[in-house]
Amino acid sequence: MTLKLTYFDIHGLAEPIRLLLADKQVAYEDHRVTYEQWADIKPKMIFGQVPCLLSGDEEIVQSGAIIRHLARLNGLNGSNETETTFIDMFYEGLRDLHTKYTTMIYRNYEDGKAPYIKDVLPGELARLEKLFHTYKNGEHYVIGDKESYADYVLFEELDIHLILTPNALDGVPALKKFHERFAERPNIKAYLNKRAAINPPVNGNGKQ
């Protein structure tokens, strides 16, 4: 099966997908389009959005649908209904945090960054820290000893917040250890080293 992932040359919504593919050593075409090219491509997309994953003849859009599709193919969706539901719940919590982050980044960065770091982020991370302790007391992955697609989303979310403020994880020790541990997974480490050489921006407006 030939895979082609289309997105901009930024982290954005595609980075957790790239992390998953890199970690599982899934071959794919990493198609990064410019904003000039996007004007021609946009009308052809199902919802006029990217990321878009071409899986053979199947076109899959929406970042959540893409990563869950890949999770099912790679054994990253839990082993029973309870685990799958927990993974989905954790993922949705991460999406809520990301929505607040992107709202600040794109709508009110200059005036909103400091209040976001001081008043919003600590509470959001504390909730995730508490939830992270559900399995194995937060010592491994989101559902304990087994990776899931939520781990890739969690790693990226923590990563971009460390770029925003280097002390972001000081109050959430389990999440901080998770981030450090996940970054040392051999395939993730290799991908991060390769990415560092390119150093793509996190967001499309150049903030971060």
From Swiss-Prot:
Residues 1-78 form the GST N-terminal domain. SUPFAM superfamilies: GST C-terminal domain-like (SSF47616), Thioredoxin-like (SSF52833). GO terms for biological process: cellular detoxification; defense response to Gram-negative bacterium; glutathione metabolic process; innate immune response; IRE1-mediated unfolded protein response; negative regulation of cellular response to manganese ion; positive regulation of cellular response to manganese ion. Its EC number is 2.5.1.18. The keyword Transferase applies. The keyword Zinc does not apply. Disruption phenotype: RNAi-mediated knockdown causes an increase in Mn(2+)-mediated dopaminergic CEP neuron degeneration. Belongs to the GST superfamily. Pi family. Conjugation of reduced glutathione to a wide number of exogenous and endogenous hydrophobic electrophiles. Prevents dopaminergic CEP neuron degeneration in response to Mn(2+). This is Glutathione S-transferase P. The lineage of its organism: Eukaryota, Metazoa, Ecdysozoa, Nematoda, Chromadorea.
